[in-house]
Amino acid sequence: MSLLTEVETLTRNGWGCRCSDSSDPLVVAASIIGILHLILWILDRLFFKCIYRRFKYGLKRGPSTEGVPESMREEYRQEQQNAVDVDDGHFVNIELE
């Protein structure tokens, strides 16, 4: 059995689609999956900047600070900031001739 069940043929009324076994559950499932795939692909292309920005930046939050005293939260923020601040003396400048 072939999954290619739609055949366009020239009929008396013009070009038409003759579907064989269109009530086959496999054909119905494949059609539904194909339509859902197309819809998801279109949505992905329309909103890819929002979606991937959310994954890139939204999931990079620090650990939860729920239940931690404010002084410890501030200390943690300061440690994170110090880890980001880098002394320029650690880098080597290479000049190409």
Curated annotation (Swiss-Prot):
Please summarize the record's notes on activators and inhibitors of this protein: The M2 protein from most influenza A strains is inhibited by amantadine and rimantadine, resulting in viral uncoating incapacity. Emergence of amantadine-resistant variants is usually rapid.
Q: Report TM segments.
A: 23-43
Residues spanning the signal sequence:
none
Instruction: Mark the residues carrying the PTM Phosphoserine.
Output: S64
Keyword field contains Hydrolase: no
GO terms (BP aspect): protein complex oligomerization; symbiont genome entry into host cell via pore formation in plasma membrane; symbiont-mediated suppression of host autophagy
Q: Lipid anchor (S-palmitoyl cysteine) at which residues?
A: C50
List the Intravirion topological domains. Answer: 44-97
Task: Please give the Pfam families that the UniProt record associates with this protein.
Answer: Flu_M2 (PF00599)
Swiss-Prot/TrEMBL site (Essential for channel activity, possibly by being protonated during channel activation, and by forming the channel gate and the selective filter) positions: H37
Keywords tagged on the record: Disulfide bond, Host cell membrane, Host membrane, Host-virus interaction, Hydrogen ion transport, Inhibition of host autophagy by virus, Ion channel, Ion transport, Lipoprotein, Membrane, Palmitate, Phosphoprotein, Signal-anchor, Transmembrane, Transmembrane helix, Transport, Viral ion channel, Virion
- The segments annotated as topological domain Virion surface are 1-22
Q: Which InterPro entries match?
A: Flu_M2 (IPR002089)
As one GO molecular function, the record gives: identical protein binding
User: Record keywords: NADP included?
Assistant: no
Cite the position(s) of the site with description Seems to be involved in pH gating. W41
Subunit structure of this chain's protein:
Homotetramer; composed of two disulfide-linked dimers held together by non-covalent interactions. May interact with matrix protein 1.
Q: Which family does it belong to?
A: Belongs to the influenza viruses matrix protein M2 family.
Q: What is known of its domains?
A: Cytoplasmic tail plays an important role in virion assembly and morphogenesis.
More about this protein: When the channel is activated, one or more imidazole moieties of His-37 probably become bi-protonated.
Task: State the protein's purpose.
Answer: Forms a proton-selective ion channel that is necessary for the efficient release of the viral genome during virus entry. After attaching to the cell surface, the virion enters the cell by endocytosis. Acidification of the endosome triggers M2 ion channel activity.
This one is known as Matrix protein 2
Q: What is the lineage of its organism?
A: Viruses, Riboviria, Orthornavirae, Negarnaviricota, Polyploviricotina
